[in-house]
């Protein structure tokens, strides 16, 4: 236990350093100590628990959510933007801008970027703004397309991203769903389809939209040949809560709805997990459950989301943690 005199010296040095902003050399000069001793006493004070730093920056609650998401789910990065009063276009545009900035910070020439469909991916592509040329980057769809809807037209999204990056873009000329498993097997074995999916399998970066299978709020039904009844069946029979690349998973992130998965012209969840860096992009309270399942399944290395979704995800974690303890 330090003596009163030593504790008083600790307090003086800590006040000068943290409260008045003096450098260690100026503190040493004022107190007649060596700079090395001041440094040593500061370190010792931290070890003794005399220093309690509280950070109160604007939007601190968002940064705290990011920290907790990373700690709870073991992801490398989390970016949480404010939820807007207009939960539609304003949030989507802000989310796309944040995701595009994060993506560009990590993009390296020579990367193969695989993308899924969705409004958040479309917003991210639209927000890409760079003067740098990524001529060695390749952009590839990991799922078939539905023509006529920009956010679900994989070939449009890949081409648009390629143009913005000055990168090579591939197109996958196949539907999202085949009529039957046999038809799906036949399509996936076609050279022009197989070659594109093989490139996607060798991607080292993935941009992933995270969708809900709730037919009342999901755009997934609009993107695919599945009906609202199909979605209800998946949710009720196998406990599906979300989808990535049209592949449905339950609350623990386990794949489900195999009879539908067999018809998908795209990567499987297991194949997506082999991509070295996977960025999930999704927002709104309705996406909390799908995001939670995706994080539980280990499908994401990074998450770009909004406050409403982040709070919902952490509430789900707390509820499940209490239930299991």
Residue ranges of model-derived segments:
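A general structural motif
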Residues: 108-112, 134-136, 203, 275, ...
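Glycine-rich beta-strand-to-loop/alpha-helix junction loops that act as flexible
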Residues: 115-120, 307
């Amino acid at each position: 236990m330090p003596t009163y005199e030593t504790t008083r010296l600790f307090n003086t040095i800590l006040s000068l350093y943290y409260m008045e902003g003096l450098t260690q050399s100026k503190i040493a000069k004022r107190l007649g100590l060596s700079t090395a001793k001041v440094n040593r006493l500061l370190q010792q004070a931290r070890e003794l628990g005399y220093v309690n730093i509280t950070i109160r920056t604007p939007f601190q609650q968002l940064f705290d959510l990011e920290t907790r998401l990373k700690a709870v789910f073991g992801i490398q990065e989390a970016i949480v933007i404010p939820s807007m009063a207009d939960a539609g276009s304003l949030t989507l545009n802000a989310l796309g801008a944040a995701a595009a900035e994060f993506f560009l910070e990590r993009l390296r020439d020579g990367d193969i970027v695989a993308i899924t469909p969705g409004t958040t991916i479309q917003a991210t592509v639209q927000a890409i703004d760079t003067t740098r040329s990524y001529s060695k980057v390749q952009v590839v769809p990991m799922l078939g397309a539905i023509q006529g809807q920009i956010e679900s037209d994989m070939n449009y999204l890949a081409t648009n991203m390629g143009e913005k990056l000055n990168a090579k873009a591939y197109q996958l000329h196949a539907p999202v769903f085949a009529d039957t498993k046999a038809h799906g097997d036949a399509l996936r074995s076609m050279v022009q389809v197989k070659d594109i999916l093989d490139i996607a399998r060798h991607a080292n970066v993935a941009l992933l939209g995270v969708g809900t299978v709730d037919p009342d709020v999901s755009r997934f039904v609009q993107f695919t040949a599945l009906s609202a009844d199909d979605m209800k069946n998946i949710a009720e029979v196998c406990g599906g809560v979300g989808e990535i690349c049209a592949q449905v998973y339950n609350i623990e992130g386990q794949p489900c709805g195999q009879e539908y998965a067999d018809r998908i012209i795209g990567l499987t969840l297991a194949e997506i997990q082999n991509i070295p860096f996977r960025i999930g992009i999704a927002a709104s309270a309705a996406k909390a459950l799908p995001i939670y399942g995706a994080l539980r399944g280990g499908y994401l290395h990074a998450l770009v989301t909004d406050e409403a979704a982040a709070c919902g995800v952490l509430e789900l974690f707390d509820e499940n943690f209490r239930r299991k303890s």
